[in-house]
């Protein structure tokens, strides 16, 4: 992959006026390959699928922003922030996939080698023919152009020095997007016979254009009133208008045998629009948000409690094929919140928060229509969908002893959703496709907890760091077996408990640093309806790192770690990877200039793998990546932006904000940049 970027920033300020802005250009050219396997849970025997894909993605992006802050007097503050962006992408992709009625790994070691149609059309040469349901080979070309702009104006006026103030915030945004997609696909159905008794074949050559336009504006007024000592009552009202329009048109190019992805659109293609595969949708949203909150500020604690009321009026004009409708919807959402901070000392605090949020299903999900633009994933609307409500609670505690250089941090999070929207899927065993209908379901929740401990030993040269975490997910979904009147829908529950631990020990002096580290992550995955799907995969790693500082301002750093996976059904996932990185840097010109040479994954062993588990199935994907590479840096520090405040304005106040817990406390894992 190739990446090229350039940035231009400026910042200046006077006593009353601050100006800043930036312009950025970015170009990316990436070649992405992936192989994957998916297991869909079914009451009467699971469905299995494998896929290979290759993509070439090119993207050009330009963004410019400006910031002006004016303080005409000590009581008034005015901020204006406009932004503009332009983007262009070109993507070429090719994919091969296949669906099977039993586990293909029971017959061959690598089913992904048996997905190309040219290789498997001869039954005598196909070891998976007895379990094969479909095979799909496709290619697509996408080009997209987008232009967007937005601006925010904020005026704040202090009415006295007791905390009474009023704030106005206005915003406008506009986006125009033009997307064109060209596709070729060939699907063979091995369980569905044609009129001649052979395998059914579906060939689709299409050109799809989808221009979209969006704009919005909003105005918000906030008033804060001190009602007692260090006690404030705040009122806020916001009105927002949003407009969205999309017009999808699909042209059938099957009647043009000379057309391909590498050729121009044929003459006369405009006469072959398929009305049933097109869609026009125009949304108009009129949103109101009125909130009230009460805030107490005391020496030892801060408490904020409030409620937001959100009446919404929506209008939809919709057309798909012969189906046309103009419909409106009026809903009422509400969102309570609570935030408590208890300060035990300057370096020790406990924070507890609660957030509640109600949300509505999309208007298109409520329409009683059938969307068969993708024959492998047919979608049906559900007018009976109810709104969902999500509860989220967080607890956070941290403390630090500067004398002993000892820190403790803990965090607990719990989230649950009532009437969450789940996809009820009906499987077609003849085609390997799905018919999906959104439905409300209860039982989705998750809990997460972590504990971190960092301390120096008495001589301060040795440090120990421990990070422990636990995550539990309870996912529910509807699984359907049978067809028509014989269809039976059942509720499935999958649970995933993941326990992790990372331990680091380090020695440091003025010129030398050496550390040892180890980590383990263990998962217990259970499926209620089909216990045979249960797995207990785990990963572990161990390694060392060192850094040597030379008297002539040269630094040598290196780290090495052995990372391992175990417990996966696919034996190719159970592997060891020895990862070695190194860096050499030299500082000169009185510390203002640094040149460094970095080498990542020197042994070329690292892989990129992602996994997901839901109540309806699990999937594993492996991606190619430029993990083994070198980088040469030259950094020269200039102080031409004046004060630190001016530099912060130039950077848009970006950053992590606040002190960190300490080096090396995060959990270990696979993939991602490996810092020195």
Give residue ranges: language-model regions:
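Primarily recognizes Gram-negative and organellar outer-membrane beta-barrels
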Residues: 1, 6-676
């Amino acid at each position: 992959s190739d990446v090229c970027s350039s940035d231009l920033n400026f910042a200046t300020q006077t006593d009353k006026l601050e100006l800043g802005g930036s312009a950025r250009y970015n170009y990316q050219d990436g070649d992405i390959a992936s192989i994957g396997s998916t297991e869909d849970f079914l009451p009467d025997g699971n469905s299995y699928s494998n896929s290979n894909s290759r993509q070439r993605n090119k993207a050009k992006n330009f963004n410019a922003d400006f910031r002006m802050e004016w303080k005409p007097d000590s009581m008034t503050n005015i901020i204006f922030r406009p932004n503009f962006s332009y983007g262009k992408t070109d993507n070429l992709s090719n994919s091969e996939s296949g669906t099977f009625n039993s586990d293909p790994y029971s017959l061959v070691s690598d089913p992904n080698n048996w997905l190309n149609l040219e290789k498997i059309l001869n039954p005598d040469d196909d070891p998976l023919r007895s379990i094969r349901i479909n095979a799909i080979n496709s290619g697509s070309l996408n080009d997209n152009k987008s232009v967007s702009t937005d601006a925010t104006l904020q005026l704040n006026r202090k009415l006295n020095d007791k905390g009474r103030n009023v704030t106005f915030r206005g915003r406008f945004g506009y986006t125009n997007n033009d997307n064109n997609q060209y596709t070729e696909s060939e699907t063979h159905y091995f369980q569905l016979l044609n009129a001649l008794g052979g395998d059914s074949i579906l060939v689709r050559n299409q050109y799809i254009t989808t221009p979209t336009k969006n704009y919005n504006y909003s105005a918000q007024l906030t008033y804060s009133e001190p009602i007692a000592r260090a006690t404030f009552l705040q009122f806020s009202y916001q009105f927002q208008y949003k407009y969205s329009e999309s017009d999808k048109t699909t042209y059938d190019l099957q009647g043009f045998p000379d057309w391909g992805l590498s050729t121009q659109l044929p003459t006369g293609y405009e006469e072959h629009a398929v009305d049933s595969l097109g869609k026009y949708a125009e949304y108009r949203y009129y949103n109101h948000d009125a909130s009230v909150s009460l805030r107490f500020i005391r020496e030892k604690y801060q408490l904020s409690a409030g409620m937001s009321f959100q009446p919404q009026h929506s209008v939809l004009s919709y057309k798909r094929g012969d189906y046309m409708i103009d419909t409106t919807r009026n809903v009422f959402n509400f969102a309570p919140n609570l935030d408590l901070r208890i300060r035990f000392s300057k370096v020790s605090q406990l924070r507890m928060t609660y957030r509640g949020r109600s949300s509505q299903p999309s208007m298109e999900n409520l329409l009683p229509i059938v969307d068969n633009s993708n024959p492998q994933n047919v979608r049906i609307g559900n007018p009976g969908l109810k709104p969902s409500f999500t509860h989220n609670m967080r607890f956070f505690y941290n403390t630090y002893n500067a004398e002993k250089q000892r820190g403790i941090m803990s965090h607990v999070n719990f989230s649950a959703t009532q009437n969450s929207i789940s996809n009820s899927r009906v499987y077609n065993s003849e085609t390997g496709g799905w018919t999906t209908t959104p439905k409300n379901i209860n039982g989705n929740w998750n809990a997460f907890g972590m504990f971190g401990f960092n301390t120096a030993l008495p001589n301060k040269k040795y440090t120990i760091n421990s990070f422990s975490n636990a995550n539990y997910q309870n996912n529910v979904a509807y699984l359907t077996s049978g067809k028509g009147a014989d269809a039976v829908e059942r509720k499935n529950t999958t649970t995933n408990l993941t326990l992790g631990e990372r331990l680091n020990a380090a020695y440091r002096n003025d010129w030398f640093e050496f550390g040892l580290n180890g980590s383990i992550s263990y998962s217990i995955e259970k499926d209620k309806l089909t216990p045979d799907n249960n797995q207990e995969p785990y990963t572990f790693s161990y390694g060392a790192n060192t850094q040597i500082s030379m008297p002539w301002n040269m630094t040598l750093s290196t780290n090495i770690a052995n990372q391992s996976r175990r417990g996966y059904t696919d034996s190719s996932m159970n592997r060891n990877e020895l990862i070695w990185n190194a860096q050499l840097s030299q500082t000169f010109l009185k510390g203002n200039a640094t040149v460094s040479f970095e080498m990542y994954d020197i042994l070329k062993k690292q892989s990129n793998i992602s996994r997901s588990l839901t109540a309806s199935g699990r999937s594993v994907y492996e991606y190619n990546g430029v993990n083994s590479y070198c980088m040469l840096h030259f950094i020269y520090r200039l102080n031409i932006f004046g004060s630190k405040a001016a530099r912060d304005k130039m950077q848009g106040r970006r950053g992590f904000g606040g002190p960190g817990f300490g080096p090396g406390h995060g959990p270990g894992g696979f993939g991602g940049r490996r810092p020195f």
